[in-house]
């Protein structure tokens, strides 16, 4: 039976959440149980490898008013917004132990999330 350790952190700066993920990744890589980190971030836009500052569709006045942080990351993707009230889950899981690839795992997470939201009468869609 697989063990998954979960931690709810609360509101955390994106950089600190990233540091927590790196620590969790090292632990899981050493054979320790998989982890999921649940937290919220203050207003932040993350720019992934395919992102560009031009993809941020709010002006400097809004960025200043909302105290938006812009954080460049080496992760995939383009631009993502995170903010207060948005629960973010970071699964740190050794997929080899589950005999799954990343695409299959992400599809299962999407299905799980859609199912969970439907129990709260929240409609969600998966775009492939």
What do these predicted ranges mean?
Residues 24, 115-123:
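Short alpha-helical functional segments enriched in proximate histidine and acidic residues
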Residues 1-47:
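N-terminal, positively charged, Ser/Thr/Ala/Gly-biased leader segments
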Residues 126-128:
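Conserved small/polar residues in nucleotide/adenosyl-binding loops
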Residues 3-6, 70, 124:
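Generic structural signal for residues in well-ordered beta-strands
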Residues 104-117:
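Long, well-ordered alpha-helical scaffolding segments within enzyme catalytic domains
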Residues 35-37, 69, 86-87:
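Structural motif
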């Amino acid at each position: 039976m697989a063990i998954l350790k979960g931690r709810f952190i609360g509101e955390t700066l994106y950089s600190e959440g990233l540091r927590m993920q790196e620590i969790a990744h090292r632990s899981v890589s050493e054979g320790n149980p998989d982890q999921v980190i649940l937290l919220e971030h203050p207003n932040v836009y993350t720019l992934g490898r395919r992102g560009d500052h031009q993809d941020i569709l709010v002006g400097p006045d809004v960025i200043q008013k909302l105290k938006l942080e812009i954080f460049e990351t080496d992760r995939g993707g383009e631009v993502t917004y995170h903010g207060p009230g948005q629960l973010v889950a970071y699964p740190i899981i050794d997929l080899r132990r589950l005999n799954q690839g990343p695409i299959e795992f992400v599809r299962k997470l999407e299905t799980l999330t859609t199912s969970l939201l439907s129990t709260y009468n929240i409609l969600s869609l998966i775009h492939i």
